[in-house]
Amino acid sequence: MTENEKHLYVARLDAAAEGFGLPKNDQAWSKLLDYLALLQKWNKTYNLTAIRDVDEMFIKHILDSLSVAPYIDSERLIDVGTGGGLPGIPLAILFPERQVDLLDSNSKKTRFLVQAKAELGLKNVEVVHHRVEAYHPETLYDGVVSRAFASLDDMLNWTHHLLKPQGHWWAMKAQKTQDEVAQLPNFAKMSQVFELHVPSLDAERTLIKIEKCQET
């Protein structure tokens, strides 16, 4: 990525942040672009994403991940089925004071995540190579986020053991899922649905917030 291209992407991040209601953050933008470069560099080796075009990666991965940042307020968060680190790494870059753990069962992807954590200097990130249903952390999380990881019902059932009571699931979905929301398990209750607007992306995006309402 040339210096001129970096300046253009920084300008787009500034504009996107204004639209999302986030402050401009030059240090975070620099790390996000470094992360984008790592995604592009290692994608062929690690098969991190089907997207090959760097501008499409910027829109569908970086901006899409940032679009949820104004809503997710969990201080200790786990990103399940994180793949190449989405949305976890962008959130960890934006909120260095929060703990963001990245879980995936694919060893190639977790190797990339370990490398990305080191190169980006993300001290608030831990990489977990595990199947989600078999992972039992010593300390429970107050937030679980996923990005098109599974059906909403599967997400809740596979991850409820990771979450504190009164903690929240944050499910990023490509479209409204009324049927899924109407059939929540008894340990979960609907909180809010946020409609997301990602610059340069002509597609529906929603963030579903669900509260864990009892011990299971």
From Swiss-Prot:
Location in or out of the cell: Cytoplasm
SUPFAM superfamilies xref list: S-adenosyl-L-methionine-dependent methyltransferases
Protein's name according to its UniProt entry: Ribosomal RNA small subunit methyltransferase G
Entry binding sites for S-adenosyl-L-methionine: G81, L86, V132, E133, R147
One Gene Ontology molecular-function label: rRNA (guanine-N7-)-methyltransferase activity
Family as reported in the entry's similarity comment: Belongs to the methyltransferase superfamily. RNA methyltransferase RsmG family.
Keywords, in A-Z order: Cytoplasm, Methyltransferase, rRNA processing, S-adenosyl-L-methionine, Transferase
The keyword Transcription regulation is annotated on this UniProt entry: no
UniProt-listed InterPro entries: rRNA_ssu_MeTfrase_G, SAM-dependent_MTases_sf
Species the sequence originates in: Hydrogenovibrio crunogenus (strain DSM 25203 / XCL-2) (Thiomicrospira crunogena)
EC number: 2.1.1.170
UniProt-listed NCBIfam families: rsmG_gidB
Known catalytic reactions: guanosine(527) in 16S rRNA + S-adenosyl-L-methionine = N(7)-methylguanosine(527) in 16S rRNA + S-adenosyl-L-homocysteine
Function: Specifically methylates the N7 position of guanine in position 527 of 16S rRNA.
GO terms under cellular component: cytosol
Pfam families: GidB
